[in-house]
Curated annotation (Swiss-Prot):
Catalytic activity: (S)-4-hydroxy-2-oxopentanoate = acetaldehyde + pyruvate
Keywords in alphabetical order: Aromatic hydrocarbons catabolism, Lyase, Manganese, Metal-binding
Stated name of the protein: 4-hydroxy-2-oxovalerate aldolase
Domain of life: Bacteria
Lineage, opening ranks: Bacteria, Pseudomonadati, Pseudomonadota, Betaproteobacteria, Burkholderiales
GO molecular function: 2-isopropylmalate synthase activity; 4-hydroxy-2-oxovalerate aldolase activity; manganese ion binding
Record's keyword annotation contains Aminoacyl-tRNA synthetase: no
Site residues, Transition state stabilizer: 10
Annotated SUPFAM superfamilies: Aldolase, post-HMGL domain-like
Keyword Ion transport part of the UniProt annotation: no
Active site positions: 14
UniProt-annotated binding residues for Mn(2+): 11, 191, 193
Positions bound to substrate: 10-11, 164, 191
Pfam families linked to this entry: DmpG_comm, HMGL-like
Length: 347
């Protein structure tokens, strides 16, 4: 049976600058539970401890968000996203105290070693620990397998490949998921973003390649161009004969019900989202890039290219300002030198 992890109340928070209310969290968690969703993930878009001036502040803290969801769930498991460095061991302790069932410990795709203590902390408490490799497009299959094996050794009960930038195509997804499925003794999952319009297709390919866990959000509510749309994914999974705890009818009832308390607008694939997917940048960076381009008066798409050259990962918003400022200085020098580009002068 395929496990569906619903990130609406976590990744969806990115789409509204992390402003979900307690009432919205309670209503959606209750509805998702009634729809038969396996895991309901809750929190700031960047996970436990993510609320900050840099990443965006939530109107309510982690404790209230998790307590609210916990009270609403009966059969669905409560999950959280945790990035070492943004969150601390104390944040996991709080989550476990409240009754979180699944802790998804997420690292950059080449930094799995920093997940060890947090996976072990979760397992010691008798809860489920998943490892998550973010920005998975930035590493080849063998590297991802080596990193996933570390998480498996630390005690992770599954490893999820996260296509954080929406960069991947079906062939890339198949190669990476197959490599992990063949090389691990634990389940493999996949988390897609829709920057290139491939979220559902990539999720189906991941399942064909042996993945047993897929992430999705109601109406695609999520960072950038959105996540895999839950309703569309479940419909396609039914067509392909995949067995789950839910049905298309139940998730459609869930989606329609959100119009009274959440009403997430179905994300459109804007040019900026396509650019972030094409250049392999974290989907949540788009509003920050647009703001910096406007403030410094630089070309937005040139800024995407520069940031791609820096190989940004999540949590490096300060580099967006740094590169926008550098582009602005180069533009000013170019004007002062009669149109000669700074990079030409330094070549």
């Amino acid at each position: 049976m395929i496990l569906i992890s619903d990130a609406t109340l976590r990744d969806g928070n990115h789409a509204i600058r992390h402003q979900l209310s307690a009432a919205q969290i309670h209503a959606y968690a209750r509805a998702a539970d009634e729809a038969g969703i396996d895991v309901v993930e809750v929190g700031h878009g960047n996970g436990l401890g993510g609320s900050s001036c840099l990443l965006g502040q939530t109107p309510i803290g982690d404790r209230l968000m998790l307590e609210t969801a916990r009270a609403a769930l009966r059969t669905s498991r409560l999950g959280v996203h945790f990035i070492p460095g943004l969150g601390k061991a104390a944040d996991i302790s709080l989550a476990l105290e409240i009754g979180v069932d699944v802790v998804r410990v997420a690292t950059h795709c080449t930094e799995a070693n920093v997940s060890a203590r947090f996976i072990e902390q979760t397992r010691t408490a008798g809860r489920t620990a998943f490892g998550v490799l973010m920005m998975s497009h930035m590493a080849p299959p063998d590297t991802l397998l080596a990193q996933a094996k570390l998480m498996e050794r630390y005690g992770a009960q599954a490893v999820v490949l996260m296509d954080s930038a929406g960069y991947s195509t079906p062939s890339l997804v198949r190669a990476k998921v197959e490599r992990l499925v063949d090389g691990l003794d634990i389940d493999v999952g996949f988390h897609a973003h829709n920057n290139l319009g491939l979220a559902v297709a990539n999720s189906l390919v991941a399942l064909e390649a042996g993945a047993r866990i897929v992430d999705a959000c109601v109406k695609g509510f999520g960072a950038g161009a959105g996540n895999t749309q839950l309703e569309t994914l479940v419909a396609a999974m039914e067509r392909e004969g995949h067995d789950t705890r839910t049905t298309f009818e139940r998730v459609m009832t869930l989606a329609r019900g959100t119009e009274t308390f959440l009403n997430p607008k179905t994300p459109h694939i804007q040019p900026a989202n396509i650019a972030s997917g094409l250049y392999g940048l974290f989907s949540g960076y788009v509003p920050h890039i647009q703001k910096a381009a406007q403030e410094f008066g630089v070309n937005e798409f040139e800024l995407y290219k520069r940031l791609a050259e820096r190989k940004l990962v999540a949590g490096q918003e300060d580099i967006i300002i740094e590169e926008a400022s550098r582009l602005a200085r180069e533009r000013d020098v170019q004007r002062a030198t009669g149109g000669v580009r700074v990079r030409e002068l330094s070549a």
